[in-house]
Amino acid sequence: MILKKDMSTENDIYQEIRPYNDAEIAPAIQRLIDDEEFISAILSHKFSHLPALLRGLVSPLVKMFLKNRWGKLDSVDAVQIEVEKYLDKALDTTSDGVTFEGLDKLDKNTSYLFISNHRDIAMDPALVNYGLHHSQHQTMRIAIGDNLLRKPCATELMKINKSFIVKRSAKAPREMMKALGLLSSYIKHSLETSNSIWIAQKEGRAKDGNDFTDPAIIKMIQLEGRKRKMAFSEYVKSLKIVPVAISYEYDPCDLAKANELYQKATQGEYQKSEFEDIESIVKGITATKAEFK
């Protein structure tokens, strides 16, 4: 894996949204191991067949396992290698293979803005990173919505895995413009410091399979270009945009997506349960997907 230097924390205007750097990895992992909600979530997923009392007795063993497995991770690249091991296992057990096209057209010494269709919350960027890594490219920084970060442990997990935060919760016009301006600036900053970026072509997954790029994404990206007084065409060219199309033979979340569309069509709205997005992430990783392309 190609190593890159971390961004300095001095005068770090992006600290609130950026992923963790090397110096922040080990403390973040320790916070995860000490987070009872995180441990409880693992117990509920891995040991759901056990009574609650017995799951509690297993908790110290889970912490010991995590400490042994993750305790030596002290850099962004070390985390990426560990994530690849989990992804290898997931792909071996839930898919019939992955086919990549176009990676040979990319320059290993160039940073790109990957704009992708969106089928699965976690697997979409994970698959692109998987292809990049196995082609000796640097892995990307990943844009994620703050709607996925309702728990501190979720924030820790995402930020140790090169994810930066898109503040979808910002609603007031001034707050929204400030958040979008910072996001646009961070994307350009990342590209200029040799870090590729992954971002979905529109907010949320395309639950009906209709892939199109939301003009709001392009407007957001261009905010930094306007600030620099660059022509639209000149600025977009400087971003080195790479369109990405991902297809799944089977979508593990297809029934949930269909139900959401049905509820919106018949009731006019759909209310997500508190942990529905997290459940979708887990199902997307662990359920059968057959072939990817």
Name every feature range the model reports, one short phrase each.
Residues 83-293:
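Soluble catalytic domains of membrane acyltransferases
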Residues 2-112, 118-129, 133, 155, ...:
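Membrane-anchoring hydrophobic helices of lipid-metabolizing enzymes
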